[in-house]
Swiss-Prot record:
Function: Involved in pre-mRNA splicing. May function at or prior to the first catalytic step of splicing at the catalytic center of the spliceosome. May do so by stabilizing the catalytic center or the position of the RNA substrate.
Gene assigned in the entry: cwc21
Biological process according to GO: mRNA processing; RNA splicing
CWF21 domain residues: 62-122
The family this protein is said to belong to: Belongs to the CWC21 family.
Organism of derivation: Aspergillus fumigatus (strain ATCC MYA-4609 / CBS 101355 / FGSC A1100 / Af293)
Keyword Coiled coil: yes
UniProt-recorded name of the protein: Pre-mRNA-splicing factor cwc21
Keywords from the UniProt entry: Coiled coil, Cytoplasm, mRNA processing, mRNA splicing, Nucleus, Spliceosome
Length: 217
């Protein structure tokens, strides 16, 4: 025992008698930055009457991740072109003349810029399609008045993309996917956007007393 800390004797304990830190213990992350949901304590404990509020993802972080994925693809294309140049040079040394043309650094840069521009344009179009899909409820109201759907509107009814397996640290991507899933679920059940949580059940509670009053008279 050292400084009145630890076991009085290490005999039979299988230890040295000193208190050590447990490095295998992992504290669950239920609060602080990056937590999926805020803790229910203090001021939040009295907010049980409020409706459920979905956590909104950070748009800047999501855009940064998408642009980073674009740069990764551009870098992979650059490495592929450079390896292709090395292969052509090796074949040219062995046979006297290569089958293909060796690209210069400027040509490689032009191809990479063209690929980057195309991927960024596709990313913007994907964001626009997501924004258009958010107006699905308004389109349904227009359909009831005889409005005909166009080819672009039919694209919104396509099945969602294959779900990705998110990592534990991808909280913003997971929140965005959860919001999209909730929107599809609301659209499938015909739930309006302005419907609050518990509104349907509270309306049923008001309906029961009125029904008993009518039966009594």
């Amino acid at each position: 025992m050292s400084s009145n800390v630890g076991l009085s004797t290490p005999r039979g304990s299988g230890t040295s008698g000193y208190v050590q830190r447990n490095y295998a213990f992992m504290k669950p992350r239920n609060a602080g930055y990056g937590a999926p949901y805020p803790p229910v304590s203090g001021a939040n404990a009295n907010d049980s009457s409020r409706g459920f509020k979905q956590r909104q993802p950070d748009k800047q972080i999501l855009e940064h991740d998408r642009r980073r994925a674009v740069e990764v693809k551009v870098m992979e294309e650059r490495e592929r072109l450079e390896e292709e140049n090395e292969r052509i040079e090796q074949e040219g040394k062995g046979k006297g003349e290569g089958e293909g043309k060796v690209l210069s650094e400027e040509e490689i840069e032009e191809r990479c810029e063209a690929l980057r521009a195309r991927l960024l344009k596709e990313m913007e179009e994907e964001e626009n399609r997501k924004g258009d899909a958010a107006d699905g409820e308004r389109d349904e109201g227009r359909e009831r008045r005889g409005w005909k759907r166009g080819p672009r509107d039919r694209e919104r009814d396509l099945p969602p993309r294959e779900r990705r397996q998110f990592k534990t640290y991808q909280v913003h991507e997971l929140a965005e996917a959860k919001i999209e899933e909730s929107e599809r679920f609301k659209k499938a059940l015909g739930i309006r956007e302005d419907t609050e949580t518990g509104e349907i059940s509270s309306g049923r509670k008001d309906y029961e007393p009125r029904k008993r009053d009518r039966e009594r008279y």
